[in-house]
Amino acid sequence: MRKLYVLGLLLLFFGQMGWSQFIQIGTGTTSSYLSGPIYRSAATSTFNWSKYAYIYTATELAAIPAGSMITQIEWEKAAGTITAPNNFEILLANNSATVLTTATTWGVVSAGATSVYNSTNQGFMGTAPGWESYILTTPFIYTGGTLQ
């Protein structure tokens, strides 16, 4: 009986473990220093600030089933080191928007969004282009549709 109980606990434990996958959206081939998520006025600038908003459509996210938990986000960034501590926050929202216009305010973009990553001491990647990875402090449940 004890062996069956332990086996049952192991099956329950391993049954709760999910699988993970990596989904790349877009080509990830930007070579611009101002493409986000951090804006720099020039490649050598010490001015680092931004508020970026991205929309990932249901078509782009078709490989992600509704109900999936997002635990990490990456952006591909051009060269340029930012070593000074910076405030950096990532907000995510499930919604039905299909476009963002230049008239869309930050208040509209951030309304109803969940803060999934927040750092007051964020440095950024080294001098070579590459992926900037963020493990979310608050995992996010994707419900299907557009992700903003």
Model-derived regions, located:
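Short beta-strands within extracellular/lumenal beta-sheet-rich domains
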Residues: F47-P65, G130-I135
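Extracellular/lumenal carbohydrate-interaction signature centered on repeated Trp-anchored short motifs
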Residues: A63-M69, F140-T143
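Bacterial Sec-dependent N-terminal signal peptides
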Residues: M1-I23
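Boundary/junction segments of secreted and surface-exposed precursor proteins
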Residues: M17-F47
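Aromatic- and Gly/Pro-enriched, solvent-exposed loop/edge beta-strand patches characteristic
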Residues: A79, N86, L91-Q148
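A short beta-strand element within beta-rich, extracytoplasmic domains
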Residues: G67-G80
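Surface-exposed, low-complexity/disordered Ser/Thr/Gly/Pro/Asn-rich loops and linkers
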Residues: G36-T57, T81, A113-V116
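Extracellular/lumenal ectodomain signal focusing on beta-strand-rich modules
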Residues: A63, Q72, N87-E89
